[in-house]
Amino acid sequence: MSKVRDAVAAVLRVNDQICAIVRQSHLLSFPGYHSFPGGKVDRTDADTLPEAPGLEGLDPQQFNALCRELQEELCFDLIAGLRDGTILRVQPLALALAPPFDFVRFRSQFYRIDLACKPDLTPDSGEIAELMWNTPNELLEHFRTGDALMVPPTRWLLEGLADNMDCGDLGDLSPK
């Protein structure tokens, strides 16, 4: 039986485009796969929300993991963006439990982060081979033509966004 670990992922959105990354080819987990910035929720992630607007109802540990991962992977300060108004909204978008194909399964909480404009992002070259802004349909087309590798939860999320970019919470996308 696979161990389940909690994770978070950020779907940064500006108008009809979202930010996706390609993971470095030397990484042990999903090398070369298209994904969203994010990672594991750690025990060290605080269980209180910081002082910033628009955080009501969010899970503190997940939110702090999201902040940490965005800072590590993209040099992006989520709290500063909330405080200065460049981030319009942070909301849970979907939950997905990866299929049991490895020793560890990730239960990923995806968060949509609506931005007023594209931020200046600096990808961590140790983790990220490429950063791109595309529509969900463009990203899915890369997968369909064999130009992109994606784990099932990433595809499920993109399919939901392709159907309705302004959707609220897509709910649990895990296979039933």
PLM segments and residue spans:
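N-terminal strand-loop-strand
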Residues: 2-53
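Core RNA-modification/binding signature centered on pseudouridine synthases
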Residues: 4, 159-176
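Active-site segment of metal-dependent pyrophosphate-handling enzymes
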Residues: 4-6, 48, 52-120, 145, ...
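Short, well-ordered beta-strand micro-motif
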Residues: 12, 22, 112-114, 133-135
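Residues that recognize and position ribonucleotide moieties
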Residues: 34, 104, 132
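A generic structural signal for well-ordered coil/turn residues at beta-strand boundaries
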Residues: 107, 127-130
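A generic structural signal for short hydrophobic patches within well-formed alpha-helices
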Residues: 118, 138-140
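Cytochrome P450 core scaffold surrounding the K-helix E-X-X-R motif
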Residues: 122-125
